[in-house]
């Protein structure tokens, strides 16, 4: 029973984060926050899975390191976008 709770809660929160990421496309900051929430839920599911199989947590630390680098890269893109465009509206940003 407790294992179902361990797996269902992160899955529900992961799906909720995906829904927020897809539906909230107005500001880049809100998209980055929902993306970090998705990565946090993936880390939580990976941690539960590795502990269930009695593996070491080395891979989870590597995953956490890469997710921190992804967050820093997203913040640097946000700062450069605010400096060049003056706001973080995602519709005003053209990739081309």
Curated annotation (Swiss-Prot):
One Pfam family matching this protein: Oxidored_q2
Keyword annotations: Electron transport, Membrane, Mitochondrion, NAD, Respiratory chain, Translocase, Transmembrane, Transmembrane helix, Transport, Ubiquinone
GO molecular function, one term: NADH dehydrogenase (ubiquinone) activity
InterPro entries: NADH_UbQ_OxRdtase_chain4L/K, NUOK/Mnh_C1-like
Location in or out of the cell: Mitochondrion membrane
Topology in membrane: Multi-pass membrane protein
Enzyme Commission code(s) on record: 7.1.1.2
Keyword Transcription regulation part of the UniProt annotation: no
GO biological process terms on file: ATP synthesis coupled electron transport
A cellular component annotation (GO) from this entry: respiratory chain complex I
Residue spans crossing the bilayer: 2-22, 28-48, 62-82
UniProt catalytic activity: a ubiquinone + NADH + 5 H(+)(in) = a ubiquinol + NAD(+) + 4 H(+)(out)
Principal subcellular localization: mitochondrion
UniProt xrefs under PANTHER family: NADH-UBIQUINONE OXIDOREDUCTASE CHAIN 4L, NADH-UBIQUINONE OXIDOREDUCTASE SUBUNIT ND4L
Entry's family note: Belongs to the complex I subunit 4L family.
Role this protein plays: Core subunit of the mitochondrial membrane respiratory chain NADH dehydrogenase (Complex I) that is believed to belong to the minimal assembly required for catalysis. Complex I functions in the transfer of electrons from NADH to the respiratory chain. The immediate electron acceptor for the enzyme is believed to be ubiquinone.
Descriptive protein name: NADH-ubiquinone oxidoreductase chain 4L
Species lineage: Eukaryota, Metazoa, Ecdysozoa, Arthropoda, Hexapoda
Protein's gene: mt:ND4L
